[in-house]
Curated annotation (Swiss-Prot):
Binding, Cu cation A1: 161, 196, 200, 207
Protein's job: Component of the cytochrome c oxidase, the last enzyme in the mitochondrial electron transport chain which drives oxidative phosphorylation. The respiratory chain contains 3 multisubunit complexes succinate dehydrogenase (complex II, CII), ubiquinol-cytochrome c oxidoreductase (cytochrome b-c1 complex, complex III, CIII) and cytochrome c oxidase (complex IV, CIV), that cooperate to transfer electrons derived from NADH and succinate to molecular oxygen, creating an electrochemical gradient over the inner membrane that drives transmembrane transport and the ATP synthase.
The name this protein goes by in its record: Cytochrome c oxidase subunit 2
GO CC entries: mitochondrial inner membrane; respiratory chain complex IV
Required co-factors: Cu cation
Membrane association type: Multi-pass membrane protein
């Protein structure tokens, strides 16, 4: 989860988020090099009085500033496309969970089980226990097995919502009448927090998401107790 005055990304908990973090660092390095080059050229223009008044054309310079941006765009586009395909691909999920956005709560249905569904509301500030997080705790957490591919089917009952868990690299729009999907895979157990990331009305800020990733045996015990 995010902390006060945090400048970087949240710790990656899924393979997708690790790839996104690496892509961020890769792109940031390219942007830093371009910015340094531009600042260097500007500083030369401001500190020197050297001019070349006889230059009518510069084929070499024109070739360089045509090819170099194309190469830079390719260096950014190829890793980006690779990650996009990775995020869209779901191979043999062990579990499917359907998520529906409402004003202003989430409902979840474990489609592989006959009658395992519940609503998830934010816990009001006055009802929080010591150590719990304001505006982030819910009455029913989404319990999922760790280290296994899980398919999330996401939609909405009313207006646009967005189901997002940053540490897992997840952000999928919940659109009425349309079913979007995302892959959830956690490398370690723990609680992972998210929120609705699409303005959906007056209580938009009160739609937290809490995923509880546990070992498979614990998940089986939990699902048996819920049915």
């Amino acid at each position: 989860m995010a902390y006060t005055f945090q400048l970087g990304l949240q710790d990656a908990t899924s393979p997708i988020m690790e790839e996104l973090t690496n892509f961020h660092d890769h792109t940031l390095m390219i942007v830093f090099l371009i910015s340094s080059l531009v600042l260097y050229v500007i500083s030369l223009m401001l500190t020197t009085k050297l001019t070349h008044t006889n230059t009518m054309d510069a084929q070499e310079v024109e070739t360089i500033w045509t090819i170099l941006p194309a190469v830079i765009l390719i260096l950014i586009a190829l890793p980006s496309l690779r990650i996009l395909y990775m995020m869209d691909e779901i191979n043999n999920p062990v579990l499917t969970v359907k998520t529906m956005g409402h004003q202003w709560y989430w409902s979840y249905e474990y489609t592989d089980y006959e009658d395992l569904c519940f609503d998830s509301y934010m816990i009001p500030t006055n009802d929080l226990k010591p150590g719990e997080l304001r505006l982030l705790e819910v009455d029913n957490r989404v319990v999922l097995p760790m280290e296994l591919p899980i398919r999330m089917l996401i939609s909405s009952e009313d207006v646009l919502h967005s189901w997002a868990v940053p540490s897992l690299g997840l952000k999928t729009d919940a659109i009425p009448g349309r079913l979007n999907q995302a892959t959830v895979t956690s490398n370690r157990p723990g609680l992972f927090y998210g929120q609705c990331s699409e303005i959906c009305g007056s209580n938009h800020s009160f739609m937290p998401i809490v995923l509880e990733m546990v070992p498979l045996k614990h998940f089986e015990n939990w699902s048996a107790s819920m049915i």
